[in-house]
Design a protein with these regions (language model features):
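Active-site-adjacent mobile loop/cap segments within catalytic or ligand-binding domains
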Residues: 58, 111-191
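Flexible hinge/switch segments at interdomain interfaces of large molecular machines
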Residues: 101-109, 164
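Catalytic-core regions of hydrolytic enzymes
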Residues: 1-104, 119-131, 186
Length: 191
């Protein structure tokens, strides 16, 4: 189950960071298996004046897809990026108000100008961090699918450098086995 695997990896990553850098304050959007709305995930980081937002996911796709990729906020530039953003943003349907709070997420020409302004503030820092993540995935033997851009709502709402990490492809049995074990999750967290 993606949400349980990703929660486990996030908690393992947080513990590793705390162990290596005890002065860093770790703030989780959730520490138990509960659903947190997309806007609230970003709001938690914003309210706590976070310096960095990391969102951990497991990818969907074909049973033969493999590797790790990291996303930063960007405009939908291709059909493939649009589909990925739609899939990640689909959890809006699970929210009580079915997305009424996201009406400000606007990709009209005016919305795009506003989004470009927001992108300029933290975009470069997000890309640099995403590149470091991908380098670490490569170091542990993961196939590097690269740093990509998409209009994920959870990244759009943050006011700090932010990344969404797609750790592995759940439909691929080998990838599912990797992140489905405590050992595999620890390996991913160490990256």
């Amino acid at each position: 189950n993606e949400k349980e695997v990703c929660l486990s990896m996030a908690l393992k990553l947080g513990a590793l960071i705390k162990e290596r850098y005890p002065d860093i304050k770790i703030i989780y959007t959730r520490s138990t298996d509960v659903f947190v709305e997309l806007a609230e995930r970003a709001n938690i980081a914003n309210r706590n004046n976070a310096d960095l937002f990391i969102c951990i996911h497991a990818n969907a796709g074909s049973t033969t897809a493999y590797g790790s990729e990291t996303y930063v906020l960007g405009l939908h530039r291709t059909d493939a990026q649009q589909k990925v953003a739609e899939r990640e943003n689909a959890s809006i349907a699970l929210e009580d108000d079915k997305g009424a709070k996201y009406r400000s997420y606007d990709l009209t020409p005016d919305g795009i100008i506003a989004l470009q302004f927001q992108l300029a503030v933290f975009h470069r820092q997000s890309i640099l961090f995403a590149e470091m993540i991908q380098k670490e995935f490569k170091r542990i033997g993961r196939y590097d699918r690269g740093v990509k851009q998409a209009g994920f709502l959870v990244l759009y709402k943050t006011t700090m450098p932010s990344v969404l990490i797609e750790t592995a492809f759940l439909p691929n049995p080998t990838e599912e086995k990797l992140i489905g074990t405590a050992e595999g999750q620890q390996k991913m967290a160490l990256a």
